[in-house]
Amino acid sequence: MDQIVNVDEFQELAKQALPKMYYDFYNGGAEDQHTLNENVQAFRRIMFRPRVLVDVSKIDMSTKILGYPISAPIMIAPTGNHKLAHPEGETATAKAAAACNTIMIVSYMSSCTFEEIASSCNAVRFLQIYVYKRRDITAQVVKRAEKAGFKAIVLTVDVPRLGRREADIKNKMISPQLKNFEGLFSTEVRPSKGSGVQAFASRAFDASFSWKDIEWLRSITELPILVKGILTREDALKAVEAGVDGIIVSNHGGRQLDYSPATITVLEEVVQVVRGRIPVLLDGGVRRGTDVFKALALGAQAVLIGRPIIYGLAAKGEDGVKKVIDMLKNEFEITMALSGCPTIDDITRNHVRTENERLHSML
């Protein structure tokens, strides 16, 4: 594993290790996959404005999210069905997160039970949820999360219906039975045609859930609530007005509405309307420590990593996940040093130049 030096190399190992159906499930996006690809490419169009002759002999990457300290502004995004990638599933991912002193957001669609994940190691964890048509099931899950020591709820708001993921349709992707819902309802779908995941989502997800229903979620938990799936200033303002405790700028990894903007391109408009009242996080397309720096320079408090975690898990289990996080942290630390930023607070908007700024400078 010492020979692996970047996320792309882990992706290739994951492709070799996983059955095609599972690799396509994790790696694919919606329809033309424009948004999926643009998430990554948009970071590459942002350039640095490094400052020199700054004392960077000591670099401090640490920060806090909702008051919880983490070693670097790199968290684990919610992704489902980790046992499709590795037999230990989310418990391996959780142990790696704990070892790296970061926060894991556990998916509602996890293979392991929330209690198994919580008992696997001592760490800060948030729980991502969808709201099902049967609200009682969502309420039960939230109460279980509270009892298991989860510290926040992350409400995904961009899935009234599942995006059209053509690889899953072609592969007849199964929807496995999830242990968290045994005795409540069946999550298993093995389709004769089409995507089982899409069939399950159509049956289970509540497409009527709206901003006014945030009050319902608040009524059943005292945990902080973050909303994941914000892409516009209008919805960012609605989130603040609804009293949520944080925003995650996300397009669901390019898996929902194709031709949605890359998350890094809309981060600033969200940050500007939020005005520091609540934390703003970002996911989508982060593959390098340089990407982490760019997101922070444009106003994010931290980034979430999704697919790279799965690549590490599929390739090398817990150790693979740790390696992915450690690589990104190392790259981020070097970027801070070379940009003249000894601490997170030293990273400013003046350290980057976006594509629009470059184009305007040419006029």
UniProtKB/Swiss-Prot annotation:
GO function terms (MF aspect): (S)-2-hydroxy-acid oxidase activity; FMN binding
Chain residues that bind FMN: 78-80, 107, 128-130, 156, 228, 250, 283-287, 306-307
Oligomeric and partner information: Homotetramer.
Classification of source organism: Eukaryota, Viridiplantae, Streptophyta, Embryophyta, Tracheophyta
Reactions catalysed, as given in the entry: a (2S)-2-hydroxycarboxylate + O2 = a 2-oxocarboxylate + H2O2; 2-hydroxy-4-methylpentanoate + O2 = 4-methyl-2-oxopentanoate + H2O2; 2-hydroxyhexanoate + O2 = 2-oxohexanoate + H2O2; 2-hydroxyoctanoate + O2 = 2-oxooctanoate + H2O2
Top-rank taxon: Eukaryota
Record's keyword terms, sorted: Flavoprotein, FMN, Oxidoreductase, Peroxisome
Localization of this protein: Peroxisome
Full protein name: Peroxisomal (S)-2-hydroxyacid oxidase GLO3
Gene: GLO3
